[in-house]
Amino acid sequence: LIGIRISEVWFGVITLFPEMLKSVTDFGVVGKAIKQSSIEVCTWNPRDYATDNYRTVDDRPYGGGPGMLMKVGPLEAALNAAKSVAPAGSKVVYLSPQGRRLDQALARSALSVPGLILLCGRYEGIDERLIEDEVDEEWSLGDFVLSGGEIAAMAIIDSVSRLAPGVLGHNESAEQDSFENSLLDCPHYTRPEIYRDKRVPEVLLSGNHEKIRRWRLEQSLLRTLQRRPDLLEQRELSEEEAQIIQELRRGQLI
Ligand SMILES: NC(=O)c1ccc(NCc2ccccc2)nc1
């Protein structure tokens, strides 16, 4: 099938624990999208490329010190196997605390590459020479250490996949997502109307869609101003948003 792209988004994952990926491939909207082939997630396990009788995948660090690194041979072989089937122009992304912080913009930008090969480190990581020669980008979920890159890889697969066309139904559309307009989300309410002696805000029962839209925008701006004012610095405000923030600052003395 030359030139006919089967899936919208293609992920290759290099991991010693391929079973972990079932957490995203077997559940929810991403799981459904995989079943419908709009997403593809393939895994390669370096252990399958180990050449010794013990199938060794770790190796000692030069310079000594605690911990091990991923053994170069099996890792390189697994990476080459993934590259041989990845769509042309795929990017190799290494998940590590030393990487660029993932945010919605980075997730959205990942949609525009043909595929992502996600390299999941274990132990203390991988040989720097492999990073230099094979890794296009290093990404991080944040400033904390996990025992492996798999959870970070799954977060990327989920956050990118849900932005792909056709993955979310119209009633779960990603456009309305809070971080899609880089504001925090407004409060949400569902049945019953009175719950724990608290009522649902009247505007949400009014059926007045313009008033509801306005209220939700005000609530998002209030919440962003209170909890993440930094998000407002890097964002252009519409005329309406700027006016709401003025009111909030006066009213709320934030
Ligand atoms: N913050 C993150 O995104 C992250 C990614 C991976 C990870 N652990 C695996 C690993 C350990 C050391 C060196 C390279 C990879 N921990 C946290």
From Swiss-Prot:
GO molecular function: tRNA (guanine(37)-N1)-methyltransferase activity
Annotated Pfam families: tRNA_m1G_MT (PF01746)
Protein name per the record: tRNA (guanine-N(1)-)-methyltransferase
Catalytic activity: guanosine(37) in tRNA + S-adenosyl-L-methionine = N(1)-methylguanosine(37) in tRNA + S-adenosyl-L-homocysteine + H(+)
GO CC term, one of those recorded: cytosol
UniProt-listed GO biological process terms: tRNA N1-guanine methylation
Enzyme Commission number(s) from the entry: 2.1.1.228
Subcellular location: Cytoplasm
Predominant subcellular localization, coarse grouping: cytoplasm
PANTHER family with a match to the protein in the record: TRNA (GUANINE-N(1)-)-METHYLTRANSFERASE
Matching InterPro entries: Alpha/beta_knot_MTases (IPR029028), tRNA_m1G_MeTrfase_C_sf (IPR023148), tRNA_m1G_MeTrfase_TrmD (IPR002649), tRNA_m1G_MTases_N (IPR029026), tRNA_MeTrfase_TRMD/TRM10 (IPR016009)
Assembly: Homodimer.
Keyword Cell inner membrane: no
Record's keyword terms, sorted: Cytoplasm, Methyltransferase, S-adenosyl-L-methionine, Transferase, tRNA processing
Gene3D superfamilies linked to this entry: 3.40.1280.10, tRNA(m1g37)methyltransferase, domain 2
Family classification: Belongs to the RNA methyltransferase TrmD family.
